[in-house]
Amino acid sequence: MKTFTAKPSNIKREWLLIDATDKTLGRLATEVAMILRGKNKPEYTPHMDTGDYVVIVNAEKIAVTGNKRKAKTYYHHTGYIGGIKSVSFEKLIATHPERAIEKAVRGMLPRTPLGRTMFKKLKVYAGEAHPHTAQQPKAHNI
């Protein structure tokens, strides 16, 4: 039996619309990462981008369990000496609601050029409105 490899011409990409209202952050992120990688398709090939486009709306209404809304902290470094910066989940959602979902999904994708290509297919919006109506995204339930 031969190993199956998807051909770029045979890869069919869909646009999926996911509503993040009252969804748990980590559980939503794992599902989205699987869709972006294409692992939900029978023609999944590890060295190719076979995933679909994902549009997430209502990112500001994402849920976290326990005390994480106040206690969860995101860190980044500016590159300067002593340049470590931190922001709580609560402040991040208040200022840039889409970044919490983007960071969670990005951490679940490969840290390679292929992973960066997969991440570009993720579109996250704070509210209900999104500019991808022309692509006719299908509602996807998680």
UniProtKB/Swiss-Prot annotation:
GO biological process: negative regulation of translation; translation
Gene3D superfamilies in the cross-refs: Ribosomal protein L13 (3.90.1180.10)
InterPro entries (UniProt xref): Ribosomal_uL13, Ribosomal_uL13_bac-type, Ribosomal_uL13_CS, Ribosomal_uL13_sf
CDD domains per record: Ribosomal_L13 (cd00392)
Cytoplasm recorded as keyword: no
Source species, domain of life: Bacteria
Keyword Secreted: no
A cellular-component GO term for this protein: cytosolic large ribosomal subunit
An annotated Gene Ontology molecular function: mRNA binding
Alphabetical UniProt keywords: Ribonucleoprotein, Ribosomal protein
Family to which the UniProt record says this protein belongs: Belongs to the universal ribosomal protein uL13 family.
Assembly mode: Part of the 50S ribosomal subunit.
Function, in words: This protein is one of the early assembly proteins of the 50S ribosomal subunit, although it is not seen to bind rRNA by itself. It is important during the early stages of 50S assembly.
Official protein name in the record: Large ribosomal subunit protein uL13
Provenance organism: Francisella tularensis subsp. holarctica (strain FTNF002-00 / FTA)
Upper lineage: Bacteria, Pseudomonadati, Pseudomonadota, Gammaproteobacteria, Thiotrichales
